[in-house]
Amino acid sequence: MAHLITLATCSLNQWALDWEGNLERIRTSILKAKEAGATLRTGPELEISGYGCLDHFLESDVYDHAMDMLFKILTDTSLHGILIDVGLPIMHRGCRFNSRAIILDGKLICLRPKLYLANDGNFRENRFFTPWHRPRHVEMHNLPPQLQEHQGVRQVPIGDVILSLNDTTLAAETCEELFTPQAPHINMGLNGVEIFTNSSGSHHSLRKLNERIALIQEATRKNGGIYLYANQSGCDGDRLLYDGCSMIMVNGEIVAQGSQFSLEDVEVVTATVDLEEVRAHRCAPSRAFQAMQAPAYDRIEVDFRLTHETTSIMEIPTPTRPPRYHLPEEEIVLRRSKMAGYLVPLSGGIDSCATATIVYSMCRLVVQAVKDGNKEVIADVKRIAAFSDKLPDTPEEFCNQIFHTIYMGMANQSSKETRQRAQDLAKRIGSYHTDLNIDDTYHATKNLLTQGTGFEPKFKVHGGSNTENLALQNIQSRSRMVIAYYYAQMLPMVRQRPGGGSLLVLGSSNVDECLRGYLTKYDCSSADINPIGSISKSDLKRFIAWASKNLDMPILEDFIHAILDMGMTYDELSRFGTLRKQHNLGPYGMFLRLLNEWGGHGKLSPREIADKVKRFHHYHFINRHKQTVATPAYHAESYSPDDHRFDLRPFLYPPAFASWSFKKIDERVEALEKAMKRGQTIR
């Protein structure tokens, strides 16, 4: 008896509420899986509706439309002959569920709702869905009339179920379930499940892929099994970027791994695997003893085999391969826009340089995809790069058509170095660059106060107060935002772009500066989207250093050393951010932790550490209001202060230096200093 089977998983660039577009991508993935000889296909979480519908999941239309799309899949005879695992939202007994639908030859076999919902970080699934808090429970689901007529039955099973096929056994788990301590695959494997499917909507953040791969390896390394992981790719309408990287593992070893970042709308990953490898892996007596004690699952018998019925097909198992990881500096990318292009205000500093380099990196990916014949990308390029009927041959040529940079300086205050760095970078990447002085705008705005009140503000060096000095600086900063949007609206017309259009304004404030509030409200940090708003300065420096060598851009070396000082280092800011968000430490707890990390002989004193901790929290508290209007940032760092839904905090805080936490820090510092004077060690 043959034990070789070909399986398929996929990454789909789905879009929330793009019903027909999502359906077409699902259909394409199934057809590609069939062409590759696969007999099982699994896809991303909620792929029919798109994962990022957010509060639209509270609308009844979403569930009706999802059933409409499911009906189209069931009635498409070209999709027969393969077992299909597809994700959609469903309504059952008045409750909303995030569910999988298992389909074979136009018939809905069962529905498998998600057991454990993601409800931390960026996720709020409990807001939309009900968890299936009945492990191993199965009941009947009433189908809508349209599906009843097609199925010939009124109900189908719904629940935590195992499918028993003619030659193997399989079961599904969904995204977050893999991350739980007692994941469903543990008892499923002990119940004889040999194939696990996992449909995910897992967004990218730096270094997150390493965690995913480790969890999937662990899922099958001890208990054996074949694991199919599917994930969404691209942006589906929110600030999250889904990074694909679908994969297939056998007994903890990767046999197939898709791209982590791809411009493909549909990427199908297939592998041929040997069921006997799983069975041989499970021969240990200790596993058998636990299997006999494991709680039993209901099984649905499916008259279908995944192995090929003919011996004329020559197959060999797909060999194992090592995992493929991107360096953090390689993971920083930009994806999807429906406007006429981009505009970035270049300051000559590393942040706007990083944003520009990310766009240039995107242009390299796009041009390579064009050369590879990617039809979807070619269609997008023809629409966006409208200045020429000819497809771009180089990234610089494409960059010049879609990317606009602008340096907005002051005649006497802007340095020649920053102006030259901006100009050199624009020339290297090929952007359409504008260099101008904004003195007239600055003086016109400054004089409005004098005209209205008779008061003439002065910079501090000319005898003015701190208030005057800050107000005059902010005129420059905020004028740049207005001018950037003005240019973004008018440049396509100035350049006589066919079809006109306007540009997407990109911001350039990094996560560390957002955390401290080291930015001006409504300056150039205010934009349509901020590609680096959740990336640390340390990672940006590494990215620029990497791009300097790997993208042949030595000009970038000049930017690495052009970094401002905020009274604390960026490495310190990164550590503050990590302890605050990931370790859930307040001011006092953070101080105690840093005593061990930064204190000791020859290192920082307790008072120096206390001053740094208090200074950070003081600025974080007084500037928190800036995050309420921060430009939407692509989520990349797990300590992001994104106020939208990732980091929910007040924006009005009582004075930090009068807080109880700071008083406790002071008490501890005094106790430590007294002990050190006595030559004692305080633990």
Give the predicted meaning of each segment.
Residues T6, N22, N166, G224-G225, ...:
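ATP/NTP-dependent adenylation/nucleotidyl-transfer catalytic domains that generate, transfer
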Residues M1-P345, A356-R383, I682-R683:
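Enzyme catalytic cores with a strong preference for nitrogen-chemistry domains
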